[in-house]
Amino acid sequence: MSFVESWRFAGARRRRQVTPGPATRPGYSDYTQGDSWGEGEGDEDEGCDQVARDLRAEFSARASSETKRAPLLPRVGDGSPVLPDKRNGIFPATAAKRTQARRWPIQALSILCSLLFAVLLAFLLAIAYMIVKELHAENLKNEDDIHTGLLGFWSLLIISLTAGLSCCSFSWTVTYFDSFEPGMFPPTPLSPARFKKLTGHSFHMGYSMAILNGIVAALTVAWCLM
């Protein structure tokens, strides 16, 4: 055998050795297969890929359905869409329209109840005025030209206190429901001290005026009945 033939024979043998064959997984011992950190990594990767594909498909389907349902936005001169103002994750204009459409029966009912309450209050005040007028007119005049009232001290005190408490409670209730957050902001004089510390307010003119209205009403009724 010549040198050239021996070189060709060695090259062909080398090519046969490096020819790729079917890849086989190397065998591991029972210890490495059972207790190693890499056990089932291939299966887990395939499962994660499948979950990721499912999530992508779901998100794409949901996005396409939302774009079909969403109305077309108006466009400006350069062709870009005009996006509505978004505050705190919501669109205030759209949310306001929806809430107004849902709450108009409640608003109408509240207005009707307020009107009925005002009519009832006016009726009660008219009756109270008639009673006070009659009691004020019923005075006795004796022979010495001294006027003597029919009402005693305790009766006069009870009537005046009742009128004052009624006026005070009405003004207090109106101020309470007209506040930003009833009972907390602004706090009432009867609210706990921690509410006053949280809001930073310890004095509210509305509740003070309610108390003042009650005092003035009590004094007015007492003066009229004397």
Swiss-Prot record:
Q: What residue spans carry the region label Disordered?
A: 1-49
Location, primary (coarse class)? nucleus
Is Coiled coil one of the keywords UniProt gives this record? no
Cellular location(s): Nucleus inner membrane
Q: Which Pfam families match?
A: ARL6IP6
Ranges that cross the membrane: 111-131, 150-170, 205-225
* Matching InterPro entries: ARL6IP6
What Gene Ontology cellular component terms go with this record? Answer: nuclear inner membrane
This protein's UniProt keywords: Membrane, Nucleus, Phosphoprotein, Transmembrane, Transmembrane helix
Which parts of the sequence carry Phosphoserine? 2, 36, 60, 65, 80
Note the topology in the membrane: Multi-pass membrane protein
Bias (Acidic residues) occurs at 38-48
Family, according to the entry, reads as follows: Belongs to the ARL6IP6 family.
Q: What is this protein called?
A: ADP-ribosylation factor-like protein 6-interacting protein 6
